């Protein structure tokens, strides 16, 4: 009888062949788990040992759950939908799929929930594919510096805290200070680019509503429809009535939809309104899952919650198609406290912040942007050269005006230079005011700010500044339209444009009537009072008589 020999090489080859040809099949060995505890949107499930992190689970009634906690003996899952019908003892099955959402151009003009299902009653959405919610952000080599401007249409932002495509710019402030209005204005301002039909100019927009009132979301949708902006916008809605799981997932759903366009070489803008409520929803989920609480009862990974979300906004390299995803996260503060936990986290992640102040808002300065602490760290590289030329001293002038204004409040006597600076500062503040949902094209912003920063408005009463600006822009549009065309064509204020502007504003002042009936171009002599009249009597000039001389006979 021959001796049986086992060769290690043969065993190794057989194992390698088996491993290389093995494909896991969920259907062939279906795992079934059971609910051991359910309540408050959370379910604990025993069994299902092969479950993946962030895998979708299906309960008996068809409701989906998301596996978040993978413990030795049980799974902690957040229920994505109504949880009243889920009870202890019910069976749970794996789907074998990580959470993903449908994406594509079919989402433009639609309102969807965080799972990509339509909420607007307009029928099913035809998707181009699916994209995982948890996806790795672009690496360093896949990015390039921000260099293209994204115009918001708001003068104070485009001039002093410019935003570029691929940037993350935080909008922060107390409630009712106009944070959402700034974001909606930015979306509305993309309409001209959309109507151009040029894919290099077009920006597709996503508005993510997290924990907002249903009436607020409806008002935003109505404003976008009225402005003709809904056709290039998607709304991802997770209202206050939704479970915490939906509020936690909504920003990732919006990012997945936006990243689909970014990786196709297109440009997208996403608004997260607001991430404070997402952090609160994640805190509720984490506490219910019995994760250890940290500062302000938030879990230890709340920074990672926002960093991995906002890092997905990027300007891709040319090799990757050159697409971009610009992020406008919104954070709500309490009592203007920007040093709280979540605000400081997001400030450190983003590329700058626009700080809106309650006092400015209540005093009628809208948008209520505090230019002193608002900053854009990278947007200046993408700013139009013409805007840089006119806005170079704007921030400094406004800062000096605020300082002088506080000093003048004590009733101190000011010299002529300080008074002139106060007068110009008041006109600049008035010039930067802007009605809601009325963004300005960049060429009109340049002309307005040129007039303010070069002293052309110094003789216009403060109460007439906004009317003067509106009428002057209309005058330039009708009589000197070549100025706007030249600014858009060259991107800068050339000497010819400046001379044309000086001529145009001099002509316009000849026709502009102030609120008190004066024409700026006509200088009237001041009327004299009675005391001056007495001293100004006209006297007839009598020349002195010459002395007479007698001739004597000689």
Swiss-Prot record:
It is a peripheral membrane protein. InterPro entries: ATP_synth_asu-like_sf (IPR023366), ATP_synth_asu_C (IPR000793), ATP_synth_asu_C_sf (IPR038376), ATP_synth_F1_a_nt-bd_dom (IPR033732), ATP_synth_F1_asu (IPR005294), ATPase_a/bsu_AS (IPR020003), ATPase_F1/V1/A1_a/bsu_N (IPR004100), ATPase_F1/V1/A1_a/bsu_N_sf (IPR036121). The record marks 374 as: Required for activity. It catalyses: ATP + H2O + 4 H(+)(in) = ADP + phosphate + 5 H(+)(out). Its main location: membrane. F-type ATPases have 2 components, CF(1) - the catalytic core - and CF(0) - the membrane proton channel. CF(1) has five subunits: alpha(3), beta(3), gamma(1), delta(1), epsilon(1). CF(0) has three main subunits: a(1), b(2) and c(9-12). The alpha and beta chains form an alternating ring which encloses part of the gamma chain. CF(1) is attached to CF(0) by a central stalk formed by the gamma and epsilon chains, while a peripheral stalk is formed by the delta and b chains. This is ATP synthase subunit alpha.
């Amino acid at each position: 009888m021959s001796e049986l020999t086992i060769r290690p090489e043969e065993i190794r080859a057989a194992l390698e062949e088996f491993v290389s040809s093995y494909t896991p099949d969920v259907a062939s060995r279906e795992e079934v788990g059971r609910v051991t505890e359910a309540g408050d949107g959370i379910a604990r499930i025993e069994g299902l040992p092969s479950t993946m992190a962030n895998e979708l689970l299906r309960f008996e009634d068809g409701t989906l759950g998301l596996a978040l906690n993978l413990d030795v003996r049980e799974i902690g899952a957040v229920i994505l939908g109504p949880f009243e019908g889920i009870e202890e003892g019910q069976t749970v099955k794996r789907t074998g799929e990580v959470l993903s959402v449908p994406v594509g151009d079919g989402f433009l003009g639609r309102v969807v929930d965080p799972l990509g299902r339509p909420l607007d009653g307009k029928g099913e959405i035809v998707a181009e594919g699916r994209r995982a919610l948890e996806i790795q952000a672009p690496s360093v080599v896949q990015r390039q510096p921000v260099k293209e401007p994204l115009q918001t249409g708001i003068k104070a932002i485009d001039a002093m805290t410019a935003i570029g495509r691929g940037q993350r710019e935080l909008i922060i402030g107390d409630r009712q200070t106009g944070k959402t209005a700034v974001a909606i204005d930015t979306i509305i301002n993309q309409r001209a680019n959309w109507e151009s039909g040029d894919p290099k100019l077009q920006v597709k927009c996503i508005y993510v509503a997290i924990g907002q009132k249903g009436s607020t979301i409806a008002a935003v949708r109505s404003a976008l429809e009225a402005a003709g902006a809904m056709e290039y916008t998607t709304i991802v809605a997770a209202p206050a009535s939704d479970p915490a799981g939906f509020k936690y997932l909504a920003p990732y759903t919006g990012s997945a939809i936006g990243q689909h366009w970014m990786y196709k070489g297109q440009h997208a803008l996403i608004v997260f309104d607001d991430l404070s409520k997402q952090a609160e929803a994640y805190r509720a989920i984490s506490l219910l899952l019995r994760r250890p609480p940290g500062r302000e009862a938030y879990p230890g990974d709340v920074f990672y919650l926002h960093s991995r979300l906002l890092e997905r906004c990027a300007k891709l390299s040319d090799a990757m198609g050159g697409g971009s995803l610009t992020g406008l996260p919104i954070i709500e503060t309490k009592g203007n406290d920007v040093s709280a936990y979540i605000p400081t986290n997001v400030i450190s992640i983003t590329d700058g912040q626009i700080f809106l102040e309650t006092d400015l808002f209540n005093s009628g300065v809208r948008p209520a942007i505090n230019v002193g602490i608002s900053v854009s760290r990278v947007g200046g590289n993408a700013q139009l050269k013409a805007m840089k030329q006119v806005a170079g001293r704007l921030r400094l002038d406004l800062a000096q005006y605020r300082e002088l204004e506080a000093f003048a409040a004590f009733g101190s006597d000011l010299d002529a230079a300080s008074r002139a600076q106060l007068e110009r500062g008041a006109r600049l503040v008035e010039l930067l005011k802007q009605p809601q949902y009325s963004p300005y094209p960049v060429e009109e912003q340049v002309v307005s700010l040129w007039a303010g920063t070069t002293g052309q408005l110094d003789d216009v009463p403060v109460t007439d500044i906004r009317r003067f600006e509106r009428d002057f822009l209309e005058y330039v549009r009708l009589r000197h339209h070549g100025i706007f065309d030249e600014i858009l064509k060259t991107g800068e204020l050339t000497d010819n444009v400046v001379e044309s502007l000086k001529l145009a504003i001099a002509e316009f002042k000849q026709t502009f009537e102030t609120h008190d009936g004066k024409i700026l171009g006509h200088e009237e002599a001041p009327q004299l009072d009675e005391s001056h009249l007495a001293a100004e009597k006209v006297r007839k000039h009598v020349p002195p008589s010459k002395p007479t001389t007698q001739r004597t006979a000689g």
